[in-house]
Every structure is written in C-alpha cells, then in structure tokens.
From Swiss-Prot:
CDD domains according to UniProt: FMT_core_Met-tRNA-FMT_N, Met_tRNA_FMT_C
Protein source organism: Pseudomonas aeruginosa (strain UCBPP-PA14)
Protein known as: Methionyl-tRNA formyltransferase
Gene: fmt
PANTHER family in the cross-refs: METHIONYL-TRNA FORMYLTRANSFERASE, METHIONYL-TRNA FORMYLTRANSFERASE, MITOCHONDRIAL
InterPro entries hit by this protein: Fmt, Formyl_trans_C, Formyl_trans_C_sf, Formyl_transf_N, Formyl_transf_N_sf, Formyl_transferase-like_C_sf, GART_AS, Met-tRNA-FMT_C
Length: 314
C-alpha cells in the first residue's frame, strides 16, 4: 500500500456496516462516520441506531448524523475533517456536488449491481425479480447523478435459481468490502482510473414498497416465482384466502391450469395455484398470528382451509 488515507465513511444499513468492518482492518484512518439519524423501530417505536452507527461507536469513531448535507454548516464540518477520500455505501442522503468536491480524491460508492444495470435504490431485489443471470458490486467514483459515475472496479456473482433477495444481499455484502479495499489501494497509488458508464444500457431499480408485494395471479407463474424470491425477506409477497391475509415466503413452478388464483391441489408438497400462465406451488406460508411454516406443516393442521377450487386474492 502506497499510503494510509484519511477516510470519511458514510453508510447506514448492515450492508454498509460490512464495508466499514473491512476498512477498520486496513491501515487507513477512519476520521468520521456519517449515518442516518436514529429511526423509530419495533413495536414500541423506540429510536434505534443504524447498524453503521452501532459499529462505529463500538470502535470509538466520531459519528455524524446530519439531516442533510446541503447546508453550508454541514459542509464546513465535513471539510474540517481534511479527508483524502469519502467512502459511501447505502447512506440514504443525496450528496450535492459541493460535498463530492471536498475530499482530495473525491467520493467513491459501492453499489450492489453491475452498473449501468440497476442504478437506484433496490438493485439486489430487482435483479432477482427480473431473472438476471448474474449480479455483483460496482465501485464507482461518485457524481451528482444517481449512480452515474465512472466505474473503478466490478466483481460479479451468478444468481442461482434458489437465490432470494436475502441470500444475494449477503453474498454481495461479502464481495463489496473486498472490492472497496482494492479500489482504495489503486486510488492511493494513482493506478486506478474510472471507465465511463454507457447510459444507453442503464436500467433503474426503483425503491421497493409493500403495495407491489401483493401477488397478481393473472401474471405468469415464472414471474411470480421470481417475485417471491426477490421479496424475501422484505417486503414479503402476500395474497389472501377467504379474506384472511396469507404471506408467501417460498414457491416453485408447478404443472396445471385454471382461472388465475384458483387452488388446483393441496398436498404435503405445497399449495398449487393457477396463474395467468402455468401454475405456482406455494411451499412456505405464514398465516395471521403464526410464524412462517413449510406448507406440509400447515397442511397437517389446517387441511380443510385449503380446499381445491377456492380462489386466492379475492
């Protein structure tokens, strides 16, 4: 390594915390950690720190939690840190150009997709939902645009037919930190230079919301199967049966046809439901007041609730 850098880290969720852990194991000096303000969480809506804040406090690092970085006071506070580089991972605040210009080497970002595909807020889930063959992490030099900056380094991983949003997240959370450490070494040595993105190839990973997690049985089974995997563990796909909500946490493609949403078969292998094209076998469900269970367990105790001919989602 050519030199140890003064680094400001900015991030919020567990994905970002994994990157901070990796940086703490390098000779670089973390001079401050920026993270989102504490948010209410849980049934009691108690204010809870982010994963990044908790880790930073464990290591005695200064923590900054501004509501915005657009005002002159916050920017002056950042400039006073005399950082060589700012590393940004799932921070959640927009960085104006004035902030991007403060560190000597600028700001770099670890983004959970193979840019320019899946710029935006939910790249992991959108890649699974779309049936992409691979995903990865791109380390880029940040610009004022949304995930538009020059690409410094890419690492890829195949997306398997069993991958969920959660499993792909965890794999990328292991790949990303190594890529960031490698990119920082190249920047410090002056040997790493960015490659411009092809905007014509860009796609956008819009933020997830609970409303889109409702299963639309008129869609093809192959699309719904990917949606179930993509939205596990959040926001979790759901439907209804006899006016009661039903969460769907596991599914596989099945054989059969009928009016969309119709239960074609119930067995220990799963609940077979007709779709717009093909059929989907629901293998892991959660009923109101219960915990997630394999359908075989529900079938043993609630067989009468899943009678053939009933229609889901009405």
């Amino acid at each position: 390594m050519s030199q140890a850098l003064r680094i400001v880290f900015a991030g919020t969720p567990e994905f970002a915390a994994e990157h901070l852990k990796a940086l703490l194991d390098t000779p670089h000096r973390i001079v401050a950690v920026y993270t989102q303000p504490d948010r209410p969480a849980g049934r009691g809506q108690k204010l809870m720190p982010s994963a990044v804040k908790s880790l930073a406090l464990e290591h005695g690092l200064p923590v900054m939690q501004p509501q915005s970085l657009r005002n002159a006071e916050a920017q002056a506070e950042l400039a006073a840190l005399r950082a060589d580089l700012m590393v940004v991972v799932a921070y959640g605040l927009i960085l104006p150009q004035a902030v991007l210009d403060i560190p000597r080497l600028g700001c770099i970002n670890s983004h959970a997709s193979l840019l320019p595909r899946w710029r935006g807020a939910a790249p992991i889930q959108r890649a699974v939902e779309a049936g992409d063959a691979e995903s990865g992490v791109t380390v880029m030099q940040m610009e004022a645009g949304l995930d538009t900056g020059p690409m410094l380094l890419k690492v890829s991983t195949p997306i398997s037919a069993a991958d969920t949003g959660g499993s792909l997240h965890d794999r990328l959370a292991a790949l990303g930190p190594k890529a960031v450490v490698e990119a920082i070494a190249g920047l410090a040595a002056g040997t790493l230079h960015g490659e411009d993105q092809d905007d014509a190839l860009a796609t956008y990973a819009h933020k997830l919301n609970k409303d889109e997690a409702r299963l639309d049985w008129s869609r093809p089974a192959v699309e719904l199967e990917r949606q179930v995997r993509a939205f596990t563990p959040w926001p979790v796909c759901h439907t209804s049966l006899a006016d009661a909500p039903l969460k769907v946490l596991g599914a596989s493609l099945g054989q059969g046809s009928g009016a969309p949403g119709t239960i074609l078969e119930a067995s220990r292998d799963g609940l077979l439901v007709a779709c717009g094209e093909g059929a989907l076998r629901l293998t892991r469900l959660q009923v109101p007041g219960g915990k997630p269970l394999a359908f075989a367990d529900l079938y043993n105790s609630r067989r009468e609730q899943f009678a053939t001919g009933q229609v889901l989602g009405q």
